[in-house]
């Protein structure tokens, strides 16, 4: 689960991570009132969406008067912001964050992620603040300093010193930087985050470090421990189909292809997408019906897949272990009664009650259901059907 910048900064403040003063606003007049409360003669108005690259897309602007704050906010609110992370459809701006201006002397990058290879949280820093960190990693990976932090000992001074020396900080800057990094580590661990990014982390004219931007993502499986974080969830920023799928215990991720996929098990689902691409097709989604699949969830899965107008065929690939194939077959029949299944459906069922399932589908005599003998055969047929060649 992701949250907005203003929400991440609220959490930072709780833990003593320095951030500029600011407040969220939902209208132009509200933005003006926020700027008036903050005082000063320079403010930043930031569109609040769950995506990076806002500055380049016109979602971050400076204002030098209260009138300008209100005008910029009114222009941003309601606009659709398209960045490299939103996709071509973009995201609608429903709130803005008004923040006091800062005296920026130097920009850095500071972040934390879970590194699966070392099986530890890793803190990363770079002198290339303000740039896309993925671009830095691809072109100049030597400019990213990393420290793996063993949770059994936590963040130590030597972790901070390695990062500080790598950034080339002056002697008097090292201690405040280490204090900043230590507070950030505590946020990450206490809140069960799986991502924190501060880009940029700035050094001000008076030598302070401030989180000028803030991005946080959380482990969904740990949200039950953090009702305060769960309340920050903004469903309007999430794919509505994915939200609907989660209500039924389905793991769904929308993709750009035209071959719909319904599979049990994440590993088999990824293998299915791989072989579809190998056969010259493009998967339209990732859909794992899980081990508790029943006719109702299968029917719902079809409804979700068919809500994508790009889908030209569906590949149902089930290996029955915990999931019984006859339940999947009955779910397919139920789906044809509840939803207009107007595309070819290639079905490969193997494992528990597979023969019974095959008989159920055969007796139903539904013309657009195409049986497949194995994974490769199913992928070939699904790709061919999507191309209108079957």
Curated annotation (Swiss-Prot):
GO terms for biological process: succinyl-CoA metabolic process; tricarboxylic acid cycle. Keywords: ATP-binding, Ligase, Magnesium, Metal-binding, Nucleotide-binding, Tricarboxylic acid cycle. Binds 1 Mg(2+) ion per subunit. Mg(2+) binds at residues 199, 213. GO terms for molecular function: ATP binding; magnesium ion binding; succinate-CoA ligase (ADP-forming) activity; succinate-CoA ligase (GDP-forming) activity. Pathway: Carbohydrate metabolism; tricarboxylic acid cycle; succinate from succinyl-CoA (ligase route): step 1/1. The keyword Transferase does not apply. GO terms for cellular component: cytosol; succinate-CoA ligase complex. ATP binds at residues 46, 53-55, 99, 102, 107. Its cofactor is Mg(2+). SUPFAM superfamilies: Glutathione synthetase ATP-binding domain-like, Succinyl-CoA synthetase domains. Substrate binds at residues 264, 321-323. Coiled coil: none annotated. Residues 9-244 form the ATP-grasp domain. Belongs to the succinate/malate CoA ligase beta subunit family. Heterotetramer of two alpha and two beta subunits. Succinyl-CoA synthetase functions in the citric acid cycle (TCA), coupling the hydrolysis of succinyl-CoA to the synthesis of either ATP or GTP and thus represents the only step of substrate-level phosphorylation in the TCA. The beta subunit provides nucleotide specificity of the enzyme and binds the substrate succinate, while the binding sites for coenzyme A and phosphate are found in the alpha subunit. This is Succinate--CoA ligase [ADP-forming] subunit beta. The lineage of its organism: Bacteria, Pseudomonadati, Campylobacterota, Epsilonproteobacteria, Nautiliales.
């Amino acid at each position: 689960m992701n949250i907005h910048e203003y929400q991440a900064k609220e959490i930072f403040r709780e833990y003593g991570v320095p951030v500029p003063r600011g407040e969220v606003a939902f209208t132009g007049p509200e933005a003006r009132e926020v700027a008036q409360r903050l005082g000063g003669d320079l403010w930043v108005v930031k569109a609040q969406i769950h995506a990076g690259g806002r500055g380049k897309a016109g979602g971050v602007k400076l204002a030098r008067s209260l009138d300008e704050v209100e005008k910029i906010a009114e222009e941003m609110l309601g606009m659709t912001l398209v960045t490299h992370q939103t996709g071509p459809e973009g995201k609608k701006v429903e709130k803005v964050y008004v923040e006091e201006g800062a005296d920026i002397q130097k920009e850095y990058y500071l972040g934390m992620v879970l590194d699966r290879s070392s099986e530890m949280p890793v803190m990363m820093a770079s002198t290339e603040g303000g740039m896309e960190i993925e671009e830095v990693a691809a072109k100049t990976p030597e400019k990213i300093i990393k420290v793996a932090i063993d949770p059994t000992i936590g963040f130590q001074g030597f972790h901070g010193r390695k990062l500080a020396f790598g950034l080339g900080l002056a002697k008097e800057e090292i201690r405040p930087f280490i204090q900043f990094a230590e507070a950030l580590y505590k946020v990450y661990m206490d809140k069960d985050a799986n991502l924190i990014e501060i880009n940029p982390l700035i050094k001000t004219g008076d030598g302070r470090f401030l989180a000028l931007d803030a991005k946080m993502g959380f482990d969904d499986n740990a949200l039950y421990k953090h009702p305060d974080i769960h309340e920050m969830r903004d469903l309007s920023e999430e794919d509505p189909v994915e939200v609907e799928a989660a209500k039924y215990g389905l793991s769904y991720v929308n993709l750009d292809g035209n071959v719909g996929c319904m599979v049990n098990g994440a590993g088999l689902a990824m293998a299915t997408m791989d072989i579809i691409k190998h056969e010259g097709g493009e998967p339209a989604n990732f859909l794992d019906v899980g081990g508790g699949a029943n006719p109702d969830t299968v029917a719902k899965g079809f409804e979700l897949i068919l809500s994508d107008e790009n889908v030209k065929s569906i590949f149902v690939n089930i290996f029955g272990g915990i999931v019984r194939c006859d339940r999947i077959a009955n779910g397919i029949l139920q789906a044809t009664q509840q939803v207009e299944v107007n595309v070819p459906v290639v079905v490969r069922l193997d494992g528990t009650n597979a023969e019974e399932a095959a008989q159920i589908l055969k007796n139903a005599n539904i013309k657009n259901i195409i049986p497949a003998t194995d994974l490769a055969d199913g992928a070939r047929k699904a790709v061919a059907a999507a191309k209108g060649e079957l």
